[in-house]
Amino acid sequence: MPVQHRTIVVGNTSTLKSPVGIVRILEVIFACVTFSLVVHTGRWGGRIGDLCMFCWCFCFAVTLVILIVEFAGVQNRMPVSWKNFPITFAMYGVLMCLSATVIYPLQYLEDKAYNSEARNYQIVAIVFSCLTTLAYIIEVSLTRAKPGEVTGYMATTPGLLKVLETFIACIIFVFISDPAQYERHDAMKWCLAVYCICFILSIVVIILCVGECTGWLPCAFNKFLSGYALLAVLMYASAMIVWPIFAFDRKHGGTPSRPSYCRSGQGNLYRVCDWDKLVAVAVLTAVNLIAYIMDLVHSARLIFITV
């Protein structure tokens, strides 16, 4: 009687036992616990709640996919650069979970009308959201490029700054479009053009790196990065000057101080009004300007790039 051999397929368990693999497992667990607790409380209705839920669920799903791909050892079959994609997503994971961790309690935890048990679940969910954010921060610190190391561009400081720049731009779009603050003056429309152009170019850089398409550029990649960073610094510097003038100067129809109707709102300790959004755009413009300046400095010093 012939001997039958059974083939046992064993995945790459070493990736799960590595420090990065362990951190990713914790990210999946923490994110799952977070959105499960929030769903249990039922306190996540509305656009802000949907946004927070999307952040936790999206991070959970993509991290789980990354774990499965690395466990199966099929990174080379994926249509993306595996030297760039995981670190890019990890950085987005930091920013998304951090935003949800800050926004959710401000919107839903202040309402004391709900019973203490529901609030306790919310507090625990916020704690696990903090842990999820911390786990992504650790992953970024473990996988980012070390001094002298030649790796994917997105693992370098300029690559991580690109992620930060696009995320901040997305937040600016939220504040500037509801209501359409830029329609107050043509100069503010210029600021909107600055945010859009720089956002699109940063996204293009990320897509080129993750998709391994940098060879499509008609010029050297490092020269393109330095030129774009310089252009972005100049454009954001102009927006940093123009936006506060036309948003807060009375001569141009602005409001220099917070209106009385913005003081408070029912059910919340703090109400975000249109004037607050103008301030938020000004602050985020300054933050992104600093990010682009750092990007320019690092891009000028970055000599060896492997995508």
From Swiss-Prot:
InterPro entries, alphabetically?
A: Marvel, MYADM-like
Membrane topology qualifier: Multi-pass membrane protein
Record's signal peptide: none
Instruction: Tell me where in or outside the cell this protein is found.
Output: Membrane
Cellular-component GO terms for this entry: membrane
Alphabetical UniProt keywords: Membrane, Repeat, Transmembrane, Transmembrane helix
The UniProt transmembrane annotation reads: 19-39, 54-74, 85-105, 123-143, 156-176, 190-210, 228-248, 278-298
Where in the numbering of this chain does the MARVEL domain appear? Answer: 15-148, 153-304
Where is it chiefly localized? membrane
Family per similarity comment: Belongs to the MAL family.
Q: What is this protein called?
A: Myeloid-associated differentiation marker homolog
